[in-house]
Amino acid sequence: MFIDRAEISVKAGKGGDGAVHFRREIYEPAGGPDGGDGGDGGDIILRGDRNYWTLLHLRFQRHIRAEHGEPGGGQKRYGKKGEDQIIPVPCGTIAYDAETGEYICDITDHGEEVVLMKGGRGGLGNTRFKTSTNQAPRYAQPGEPYEERYVIFELKLLADVG
């Protein structure tokens, strides 16, 4: 079966939340803030692959999601970045936004990669908000939300014989 058009929903990952945490060690009852930053959300990446000839593999995969970033931790531990979701497409694939009809990209070569959607940035931990006047901040920044969009993939074909 030859499929030259597919419409799918893609979601980038949400950024992890920053942590509110305070240093606690023996003989040091009032340690300062040490909350870590949240990890970035995963990206959605299109990659040209000469081993694919049609968009059949996308026809039955209607929703593609990247991983969310993990929240930060105590002792200034950063959250892990969400894993990127790589979508293999045949060379000669054009991507459009389904709602606006806006052209997004054109994959022409094998191995060519285009970031379709960026994941959300991770939030900052309370260590980042420490100042000379506020030495123990009790707040951290939440991670940025994810993006969602419907994308149409079209495979352009060049006929050798008419």
Segments the model singles out, each with a brief description of its role:
Residues 1-161:
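Conserved P-loop NTPase architecture
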